[in-house]
Amino acid sequence: MDLRALIRLVPDFPRPGILFRDMTPLLQDPAGFRAAIEQLAAGTTGMGSLDYVVGIESRGFILGAALAQHLGLGFVPVRKPGKLPPPVLSQTYSLEYGQDQLQLHAHALRPGERVLIVDDVIATGGTAAATAQLVAQSGAEVGGFAFLIELAFLSGCKALPPGIPAHVVMVEEGN
């Protein structure tokens, strides 16, 4: 199935110069959504035993929860500040113009557990790398990453921790 045909390209959103990838049509298409989850799952076969899927707010929740269900794993959300009740672990990371932060329930993961980090798009890799740092703070281990789309021109996969497999369903070369 051609998943690209189910991704709507929206120019100049959320600001001028950005070509936004809207996955709403993909989510509305039962066969397309199922194919996306199956293709994400196919990339996890070489990642070893996994205990949880960690989904990054917000579209990583949609894909991550569906993928967790498909793989028979639990789901753990990583959220923006102030969305989770305490205690939480926090990780600050750099953006192009400033900083942002992500949070994880302090007791959601335990030492020795292995997780798959999932998001819809990897652009610069900052959000995924910060999520990996949160997982490390918890004592758990990142077994792999899975993304529906990689914006290759931003080199985000190079920002991920070395030696950890990353699976991408679709690679976009241009902005």
Swiss-Prot record:
E.C. numbers: 2.4.2.7
Keywords recorded for this protein, A-Z: Cytoplasm, Glycosyltransferase, Purine salvage, Transferase
Location, primary (coarse class): cytoplasm
Entry's localization field: Cytoplasm
Pathways per UniProt: Purine metabolism; AMP biosynthesis via salvage pathway; AMP from adenine: step 1/1
Reaction catalyzed: AMP + diphosphate = 5-phospho-alpha-D-ribose 1-diphosphate + adenine
Gene Ontology annotations of biological process type: adenine salvage; AMP salvage; purine ribonucleoside salvage
InterPro entries xrefs: Ade_phspho_trans, PRibTrfase_dom, PRTase-like, UPRTase/APRTase
Taxonomy, superkingdom: Bacteria
GO molecular function annotation: adenine binding; adenine phosphoribosyltransferase activity; AMP binding
Role: Catalyzes a salvage reaction resulting in the formation of AMP, that is energically less costly than de novo synthesis.
Subunit annotation: Homodimer.
Protein name: Adenine phosphoribosyltransferase
Organism: Synechococcus sp. (strain JA-2-3B'a(2-13))
Taxonomy of the source species: Bacteria, Bacillati, Cyanobacteriota, Cyanophyceae, Synechococcales
